[in-house]
């Protein structure tokens, strides 16, 4: 029996010159600051299509850095977005990064409003920044489940593949199974762990 909890990988979002030094994943920027005390920039622009990048923005704000968030969504609402608003973090909804600008490193970005159907851009603006922190949501790390012969399936809600029907004695939990709530992850992991223990020992404890 194998309990797989291999996590997930943050996706980038593609735009012009996104290989310019200073373009980083939002989660990496947060970890550098929170764990190592390293700032990836003093004028961060955060480009996202989901809530997780707001954690990065909040971490910047706690360290007296004022980020600007560009969110592709029209009117997203959640607890973490409300928290960011209450902290005075600047946000632009229905906005995208068109291109990073700068030669040896990012020094600005071309941004634009995007239509509701995501097909048309408004007037392109230029905004000063020294880094662009990107989050295109998370892709479950399904490699171990897939290699075991598990027939994966596509989850439209998260736009990613997750483990489907198990072929060997493997069980996948947490974000590797498309569950991104810590509470739900812990609950299901304990449940599956208990089931496996009961199966192996024939004891219900």
Task: Report the location of each language-model feature.
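Residues forming the flavin
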Residues: 1-205
């Amino acid at each position: 029996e194998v309990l797989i909890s291999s996590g997930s990988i943050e996706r980038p979002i593609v735009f012009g010159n996104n290989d310019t030094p200073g373009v980083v994943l939002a989660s990496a920027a947060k970890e550098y600051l929170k764990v190592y005390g390293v700032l990836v920039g003093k004028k961060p622009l955060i480009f996202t299509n989901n809530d997780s990048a707001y954690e990065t923005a909040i971490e910047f704000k706690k360290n007296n850095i004022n980020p600007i968030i560009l969110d592709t969504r029209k009117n997203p609402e959640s607890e973490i977005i409300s928290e960011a608003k209450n902290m005075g973090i600047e946000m632009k909804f229905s906005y995208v990064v068109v291109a990073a600008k700068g030669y040896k490193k990012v020094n600005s970005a071309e941004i634009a409003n995007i239509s509701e159907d995501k097909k048309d851009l408004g007037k392109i603006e230029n905004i000063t920044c020294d880094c662009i922190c990107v989050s295109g949501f998370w892709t479950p790390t399904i490699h171990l489940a897939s290699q075991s012969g598990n027939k994966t399936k596509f989850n439209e809600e998260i736009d990613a593949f997750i483990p489907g029907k198990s072929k060997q004695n493997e069980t996948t939990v947490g974000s590797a199974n498309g569950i991104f709530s810590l509470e739900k992850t812990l609950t299901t992991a304990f449940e599956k762990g208990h089931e496996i223990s009961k199966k192996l020992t024939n004891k219900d404890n």
